[in-house]
A protein has these predicted regions:
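Basic, polyanion-binding surface patches
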Residues: 2-144
Length: 144
């Protein structure tokens, strides 16, 4: 990431859970992670490399900086990588008529810890208290 100045984030979903799990395996240098995970490569607009074609949402992210955080363990490290999203790819079938993302159809996957995962299958709206119309529009990602 630091060498190329780019990285790609692919949304993990319930439907991709097996590929996500396979992608956690450390592979020998040069072995194709996409092939090993059983997913298809899609080209990026600027980032070198590829994104996961089966993922409903992908971000091409320009590298900003890395923070190397000590873990207290001489064998392992924790690196926090910070970037700026340069390009967002969203499959059309997951964009609702109002322009929002159909999260319930995507079923985003989240790791809870241990061997446990969950996915989004319920959603509710909760507006910020005492927010102005302009602030609420900003929270929705609008600029009007």
């Amino acid at each position: 990431i630091e060498e190329t100045g780019w990285f790609v984030w692919n949304m993990a979903t319930y439907d991709l859970r097996e590929a996500v799990n396979r992608s956690a395996k450390a592979l020998p240098y040069g072995e194709d992670e996409f092939e090993f995970a059983g997913v298809t490569k899609a080209s990026c607009l600027e980032a070198p490399g590829a994104r996961v074609a089966e993922s409903p949402i992908n971000f091409e992210i320009e590298f900003v900086q890395s923070l190397h955080i000590p873990t207290g363990n001489p064998v392992s490290t924790f690196d926090l990588i910070i970037g700026r999203v340069a390009h967002v790819h969203i499959k059309d079938e997951f964009i609702l008529d109002d322009g929002k993302i159909d999260i319930l159809s995507i079923k985003p996957l989240a790791r809870l810890g241990y061997y446990d995962y969950t996915y989004v299958d319920k959603m509710f709206e909760m507006k910020a208290p005492a927010a102005t119309a302009e602030e609420l529009a900003g929270l929705e990602g609008r600029t009007d």
